[in-house]
């Protein structure tokens, strides 16, 4: 195959992959992609929707390249209905801390008492002074979370347990105080600051409401989708509005913030890590957060199955809002179940007919080690794999599985051919 052609093909592929659609700010208009364009099967989509309906969902949206592929509402919910984000809304607060830092109102390395005042905890002065905004963002304040109400922000509820940065615990109370940090340094409430800096430029709606000791965000599903799209594009809206200019903060927020729980960033949950910890536990578990999801997934998770999933390798965002699916608080496991249905959307059962490559299907993509090939190989086909420089790095006779374990990570081209024809496919090796 011509090397120059392959390199040009790669460049076009990368440009195409990078293009994102952004819906108008002051409109309900939102471009769509037909599932048929993605080779998604109606019966698989029906199975996904049936599962969501059976688990008391209210809303589900899936974006590809910024456009809506799937949008479904259940149980009386509709496009204009607001619903709570629960702890998924923590990611909004993290984003606003990043905005406050880029505007020089604060630094996340500042001690929290600089903005909350001395005596905001029941610790000694030296213990309290050691707690920073960064510790609040990463759930590593060292304050005792084993209290009657983990959301209580009274000083008597905030007691020393370990030095900041040495213990990870999912503790709502220190997080809840971040809105006071913003208000005391910016001079605006979190809601008003968000309205100016986030909601207006992206077209989001919504509001943080105080429910007991917790501030809970309510919005439409499409507003949650807008935030996911903003995150997918690195804090940039529409290509010419870089809302989050502090790229260091942005990148840190969606990567491991510490090594105690590497599956946690700045209030975002991270997939693809070798270990993780979960709320209400000090146990470290081996393995990924969501085994059915791509490794580069980062996700906002909230009580009763609220979730916002962002997958850069697939230019995909999807969300679920709803009631508790199993009459109990859930986080990662339910999200993983939804991923199992999403992975089945592609019509992989289609065969490769004799002399016809139009229906060949690869999965998973992105892939780690083994690439499965779906089809009925009634003729002899060969495969060749090329890197981004157009160099052939592997080849062989096509079977139902290709071993990619020895191939470096990155974007590659797979060529399937016989004496009659050939076809190119993009794959991403993780």
Residue ranges and their predicted role:
Residues 79-80, 142-218:
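Catalytic-site signature segments of enzymes, centered on catalytic residues
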Residues 297-349:
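Structured C-terminal helix/loop/strand segments within mature extracytoplasmic catalytic/sensor domains
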Residues 355-430:
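C-terminal outer-membrane/trafficking sorting elements
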Residues 162, 203-312, 325-328:
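Penicillin-binding protein/beta-lactamase superfamily catalytic region
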Residues 103-141, 188-220:
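Active-site helix/loop module of the DD-peptidase/beta-lactamase fold
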Residues 66, 83-109, 136, 178-182, ...:
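Active-site SXXK
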Residues 19-32, 346-363, 376:
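Residue-level detector of functionally pivotal "anchor" positions at catalytic/ligand-binding pockets or at interdomain
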Residues 48-77, 308-309, 315-319:
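A short, well-structured edge-of-sheet supersecondary motif
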């Amino acid at each position: 195959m011509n090397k120059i052609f392959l390199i040009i093909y790669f460049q076009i592929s990368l440009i195409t992959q990078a293009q994102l659609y952004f819906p108008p700010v002051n409109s309900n208009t939102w471009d769509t992609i037909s599932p048929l364009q993605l080779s998604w099967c109606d019966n698989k989509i029906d199975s996904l929707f049936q599962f969501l309906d059976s688990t008391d969902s209210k809303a589900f949206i899936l974006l590809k390249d910024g456009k809506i592929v799937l949008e479904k509402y259940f149980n009386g919910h509709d496009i204009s209905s607001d619903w709570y984000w629960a702890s998924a809304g923590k990611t909004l607060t993290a984003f606003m801390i990043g905005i406050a830092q880029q505007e020089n109102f604060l630094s996340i390395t500042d001690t929290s008492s600089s903005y909350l005042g001395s005596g905001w905890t029941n610790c000694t002065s030296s213990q309290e002074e050691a707690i920073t905004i960064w510790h609040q963002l990463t759930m590593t304040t060292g304050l005792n979370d084993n209290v009657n109400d983990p959301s209580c922000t009274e000083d008597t509820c905030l007691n020393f347990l370990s030095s900041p940065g040495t213990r990870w615990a999912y503790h709502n109370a220190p997080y809840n105080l971040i809105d006071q940090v913003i208000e005391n340094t910016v001079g605006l409430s979190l809601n008003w600051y968000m309205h100016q800096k986030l909601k207006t430029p992206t077209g989001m709606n919504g509001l943080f409401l105080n429910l007991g000791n917790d501030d809970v965000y309510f919005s439409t599903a499409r507003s949650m989708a807008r935030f996911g799209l903003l995150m997918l594009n690195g804090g940039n809206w529409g290509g010419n509005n870089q809302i989050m200019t502090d790229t260091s903060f942005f990148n840190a927020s969606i990567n491991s913030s510490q090594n105690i729980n590497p599956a946690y960033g700045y209030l975002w949950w991270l997939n693809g890590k070798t270990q993780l910890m979960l709320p209400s536990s000090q146990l470290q578990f081996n393995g990924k957060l969501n085994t059915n999801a791509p490794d580069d997934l980062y996700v906002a998770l909230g009580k009763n199955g609220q979730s916002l999933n962002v997958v850069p390798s697939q230019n995909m965002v999807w969300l679920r809002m709803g009631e508790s699916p199993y009459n109990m608080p859930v986080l990662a496991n339910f999200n993983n179940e939804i991923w199992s249905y999403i992975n089945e959307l592609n019509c992989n059962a289609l065969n490769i007919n004799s002399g016809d490559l139009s229906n060949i299907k690869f999965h998973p993509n992105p892939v780690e080690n083994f690439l499965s090939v779906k089809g009925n190989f009634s003729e002899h086909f060969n495969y060749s794999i090329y890197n981004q420089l157009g160099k052939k790095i592997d080849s062989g006779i096509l079977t139902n599985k290709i071993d990619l374990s020895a191939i470096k990570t990155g974007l590659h081209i797979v060529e399937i051919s016989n004496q009659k024809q050939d076809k190119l496919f993009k794959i991403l090796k993780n």
